[in-house]
Amino acid sequence: LGINKPDGCMEQEWVLNHLNKYKKWVERVTISGGEPTVCRGLGELLGTIKKIGLSIKLDTNGSKPDTLKELISKGLLDFVAMDIKGPLNNYGKYCGVEVDKDYIEDSLNTIINCGIGYEFRTTYVPGLHSENDLYEVAEYLRKKGVKNYKIQWFQPKNTLEPSYMDIKPVSKQTAEHIKKSVGLIFKD
């Protein structure tokens, strides 16, 4: 859900026609964005997708915990991937806007305790994040019992913020070092 309408959400009819056309080749659907939980009618769309027989993964930033709880309680999701933008103590820095951290924590706790598959992930943006930011997020998640934390590496392509096009991607060596260090945090 992400384009075509003024509110940024796709026309449900188009989505359903497309899925029905290709359903013999498709087993699962990822609902992504923007932020799909702000789209009106999301639950209705997911219910229809479920009736087609497809599994559903939701990508979310966690800003709408009540919507997330409703979708989970209705059995409309099979997997949730939530972006953790950075350490919660300075979350607005990583989002570019102030965010109610309680919503983020509420969504995080809902996902951890909901009984379906999940992962948390942070996109590392050089110059915005430090390595210590990632270690802080990893330690926070480990203490909550999370086992599935992924780091994504920022790529300067199709960015909403033009200045981000000038950011140099993380070197392979740095990425491997960070992945190894984060992995050690999750070792028991």
Question: Locations of the language-model features?
Answer:
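Canonical Radical SAM [4Fe-4S] cluster-binding loop centered on the CxxxCxxC motif
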Residues: 1-14
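Short acidic, glycine/proline-enriched helix-loop-strand junctions
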Residues: 104-105, 118, 159-188
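Short, charge-patterned binding micro-sites
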Residues: 34
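Electropositive phosphate-/nucleotide-binding environments in soluble metabolic enzymes
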Residues: 9-12, 131, 172
